[in-house]
């Protein structure tokens, strides 16, 4: 999405044709503009059937090649990044599974690079779209503890990635892109930008003006820390993971809120605005 966001292969959008550029509305409620030639037109019925079938999988590795055959020597047809959606077919061989892409291409991907998709496109056709995001729950059968553990594990997979404004991919990602992708990969759609937005599940559990010592009392692994124009994920023991465009870092790393820790960032510790949680 021009200058603001990144939409991946296999993701659904609603769109309105405005010529060379089209206005799109994503399945997570974000609006923007895309070039017309980047869209593969599908019907609403196609989207609903895909959701109902339940065989959409998401790429979990930084990158995964789609191969003509089920072997490493086969010809590469496409390279997909973390977050791309594919339709998983029944055919498996040598640790590979056959997948079908939204553009009709079919090939093989290592099964280890995929996981069942947990989020939903229902916002795009639901009757109560204004309530859709706040009424989401964590994946069925998951405990709060499991969800928190999974989002932290997923977030750590972005450590070392370079910073890219508006990015959400393993080859370049911004601060809100990291936390958005981590929650999406674990079945919960949050607001894409670095703030808490009404109508989404993230709610404030601490605000600027309260005692700083309460941050560590209230925040748990997987909760989010918000600054003005910046966001990170709380881990434990005062540490947080974030992707920063700071000239000395320019990427995804871990820092601390605790003065005296080697990775303490005084500027961020003193400027914290809000702590948010989907379990508030």
Segments and roles (model prediction):
Residues 224, 229-239:
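Catalytic nucleophile-His microenvironment captured as a short glycine-rich beta-strand/loop
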Residues 5-6, 79, 215-218:
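Residue-level "contact hotspot" at macromolecular interaction interfaces
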Residues 1-2, 11-13, 18, 25-60, ...:
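Boundary regions of SH3-family modules and the immediately adjacent low-complexity/disordered segments
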Residues 9-10, 80-86, 221-222:
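Loop/turn positions that initiate beta-strands
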Residues 163-177, 181-219:
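Catalytic cysteine-centered active-site loop
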Residues 41, 64, 71-77, 204-212, ...:
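Aromatic- and glycine-rich peptidoglycan recognition patches
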Residues 162, 167-168, 228-230, 243-250:
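Active-site loop architecture of trypsin-fold serine endopeptidases
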Residues 135-137, 156-167:
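Short, flexible active-site loops
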